[in-house]
Amino acid sequence: DLAGKSVAVQLGTSGESLLSEGGDLESLAKTFGSLMTCDSFLKCFTELGGGAVDAVIVDKPVATSYVQQNAGFTILDEELGAEQYGIAFRSGDQELCDTVQAAVQKIVDNGTYAKIAEKYPDIVNNLLFLSK
């Protein structure tokens, strides 16, 4: 879908790394008409809205949120990669770690997690899974 198109990606993101020289998707990037890097995802969308680029490559939750709030954009079905996210704590701050773990476990146990997963099926794979 993007062959010959102008594409924007945020500087310093995994999207940029994948598309850059030596990245896993370097060959895909070579099919683009041009690849612009922007300092922020908002700048990417500004360039898209202004017609400077034909598409932007951003994380799916960012794209989904932006499209919901701004008419005239759509998300393509292709996914370029998958990432996992975690929560980091200062070394030795076990109390904070335990507090966050307990809060997340609570939403799993009380069914809130299942409701979130049902309401937002596109992001369910990005949510934290815990054992009961």
Predicted regions and their residues:
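Periplasmic-binding protein-like
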Residues: 15-18, 60, 64-120, 123-132
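Short, flexible helix/strand-to-coil boundary loops that buttress conserved ligand/catalytic motifs
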Residues: 23, 67, 117
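Short, Asp-centered acidic motifs that coordinate Mg2+ and/or phosphate
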Residues: 54-55, 74
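Soluble non-cytosolic domains of exported or imported proteins
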Residues: 9-13, 39-42, 57, 90-98, ...
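Hydrophobic residues within well-ordered alpha-helices
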Residues: 2, 47-49, 87, 100
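Bilobed "Venus flytrap"/periplasmic-binding protein-like clamshell domains
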Residues: 1-45, 60-64
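Conserved functional loop/turn residues at catalytic and ligand-binding sites
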Residues: 6, 52, 111
